[in-house]
Amino acid sequence: MFQRLILILFFSVYGLMAKGQQNINSIDSFRLYGDVKITIDKPVNFSPNKKTIISFFALPNGNSTEQTMGKKMQTGDDWHFDIQHIRAQTKFIRQQLPKKNFVVIYLENNYKSWPAWKQKHPDFKNEIPHLVDSLAGLLEAKQKVIYLNGHSGGGSFIFGYLAGVEQIPSSVKRISFLDSDYGYDSSYYPKFKNWLQQVKGAALNVFAYNDSVALYNGKPVVSARGGTWYRSHLLLQHLQKDFSFSKTNTDSLIIYKSGNSQIQFYFKLNLNQGIYHTQQVELNGFIHSVLCGTKKDSKKYSYYSTRAYADLIK
């Protein structure tokens, strides 16, 4: 029933496609479950003959899809429009991957919080995987892979997906936590381990800053064990029992990579007790979450550096 409904919605959105791609906006939205907004950013030159990457991006708490996409700022604009720029970063990624279709599916809900949405949906363990599978099924391509990505509370969507599958399917090739793995605990580790060891091309990357010392108005932002710094290190500790890692340091980052770069962790130092939550996305974070460990890793951009996509912001 759900798949039938989603197909009806899809064809109502893309029903004009047969009349010519030149007349089709590459971004379209529709709603599911009554409280979920789906926005598909599909390249205008989409070809079913190209390998297709479908990147699900679960929105951070408190942000709309439009704010997450970003825009060129004008006087009076809300500051949220200038902190992620996923749309411009998507354009950059497409320039680096011209032989592939790179599709982004933004996932927003009425509560602007995936943890809150899951509380309202006790059957989320079934609903989230079904949502992902059904949306991926809408895109016709000879070869499709799924990336799961999210910032802040968006990580809760990813964990909801993981909780709902017995094992991570081989169609999922990349999981990225952009300062968003607050919900990690040891119960998820066996699924990560089996997926990384058994699925060819599986890649995991995690971004976090030392939020355990961050202050806002003189008060801690998170508890000592409640933030991504602690949760990311916990995941790393579990992985180190089964995978070997190298460690490197820069002026502001501690980086761990597995031997084949299949797994990567980026830890942002915090020497002034500041808040560096959104900067990890803004400073080429989405780009790096997609390209790190590939042949395009750090080509024409650097993570946590000047916006490589600045001229693509509209």
Give, region by region, the residue ranges found by the protein language model.
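Alpha/beta-hydrolase fold nucleophile elbow
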Residues: E140-S152, I175
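Short, surface-exposed "cap/lid" segments of acyl-processing enzymes
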Residues: L32-K37, V44-K99
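Alpha/beta-hydrolase active-site loop
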Residues: R87, Y106-E140
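Bacterial Sec-dependent N-terminal signal peptides
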Residues: M1-Q21
